[in-house]
């Protein structure tokens, strides 16, 4: 449930708390703008990735499928500052060879990115949604991102990137599958 009025009131209160006049010309519409922005940034809250993965095709394909460099942005739940980067996903279809359209994997990323988030959990959620939705033999997810909470505040280290992974099934059990995936996502175009 998205409460636009509560967000507008909270933004107005925050502006007052930092000593600003929320009625001055440049800030009059800020509470409304922020509420609209949050509606977009957190639109994944009420979406179910299982719905996205429901439609698939049993093609008999049993080899690794990879989509890499899926761009995303999300909001860190600790400071409500953005983090952004790319997600790499690989999966190995099950015995039926069930695959999904590649845009479906990007949509799963979007659903989880558009929530208050931490990168580690996002990798886990994406991997779990894909292995549960596709019933595939294995899933690998790698996320590389730059966090504004490390750039704008605190330690102030621009350019540093956080890399997280989540491995399920055959990618967790098989060093060869894991190595092939990691090798393929590192290849340049």
From Swiss-Prot:
Enzyme class: hydrolase
GO process annotations (BP): one-carbon metabolic process; tetrahydrobiopterin biosynthetic process; tetrahydrofolate biosynthetic process
Name of this chain's protein: GTP cyclohydrolase 1
InterPro entries for the chain: GTP-CH-I_C/QueF, GTP-CH-I_N, GTP_CycHdrlase_I, GTP_CycHdrlase_I_CS, GTP_CycHdrlase_I_dom
Hydrolase found in the keyword field: yes
Coiled-coil segments on the chain, per record: none
Residues at which Zn(2+) binds: 76, 79, 149
Assembly description: Toroid-shaped homodecamer, composed of two pentamers of five dimers.
UniProt signal peptide: none
Gene3D superfamilies named in the record: 1.10.286.10, 3.30.1130.10
Keywords assigned: GTP-binding, Hydrolase, Metal-binding, Nucleotide-binding, One-carbon metabolism, Zinc
UniProt source species: Dehalococcoides mccartyi (strain ATCC BAA-2266 / KCTC 15142 / 195)
Originating gene: folE
Catalytic activity of the protein: GTP + H2O = 7,8-dihydroneopterin 3'-triphosphate + formate + H(+)
